[in-house]
Design a protein with these regions (language model features):
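Non-catalytic signal-transmission and effector/linker regions of two-component phosphorelay proteins
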Residues: 1-10, 116-132
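Two-component/phosphorelay signaling modules centered on CheY-like receiver
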Residues: 18-37
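Conserved acidic carboxylate
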Residues: 15
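Helix N-cap/capping motif at the beta->alpha junctions
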Residues: 38-47, 68
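Hydrophobic/aromatic residues positioned on beta-strands within the core alpha/beta folds
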Residues: 89-90
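Active-site residues of response regulator receiver
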Residues: 60
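Alpha4 helix (beta4-alpha4-beta5 surface) of REC/receiver domains from two-component response regulators
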Residues: 70, 82, 93-110, 122-126
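Receiver (REC) domain active-site loop signature in two-component systems and cognate sites
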Residues: 63
Length: 132
């Protein structure tokens, strides 16, 4: 029963690193989340969001073409999928990035790589209660 509810959650994973993308998708699958769409940069994510609305966005900051901050700016300026929670997952240890991330409306968490999947699972569990 728990997995049925969990599987309803649509997750957009925005991550350019193929290995990290694969590992994160696999870990989310192991946690019962199977409705995951993965894209490699912010531009692909914006294109995806024009026709789709996920329940959660997991976002890397450092990507080619359109990075995470540019993605969030474009998303807000174009009022695309407002209210969809964003979990930032980044290798950037810069305090300025963490502070800048707090200025965006939908950012609910900032996690540093290597990703602590227990923390991500707790975030997903708390969100799942809101998504029912």
């Amino acid at each position: 029963m728990e997995n049925k509810t969990t599987n309803l959650c649509k997750i957009l994973l925005i991550e350019d690193d193929v290995v990290t993308n694969f590992i994160t998708t696999s870990k989310l699958n192991n946690l019962g989340y199977s409705n995951i769409t993965a894209v490699e940069n912010g531009k692909e994510a914006i294109d995806y969001l024009k026709d789709n609305k996920p329940d959660l966005i997991v976002l890397d900051l450092n990507m080619p073409i359109m990075d995470g901050f540019e993605f969030m700016e474009s998303k807000e300026q174009n009022c695309i999928c407002m209210g969809v929670p964003i979990v930032i997952v980044t290798s950037s240890g810069r305090p300025s990035d963490k502070e800048k991330a707090k200025t965006f409306l939908d950012v609910i968490s900032y996690l540093e790589k290597p990703l602590n999947y227990d923390k991500l699972q707790k975030i997903l569990m708390s969100l799942r209660q809101c998504l029912k």
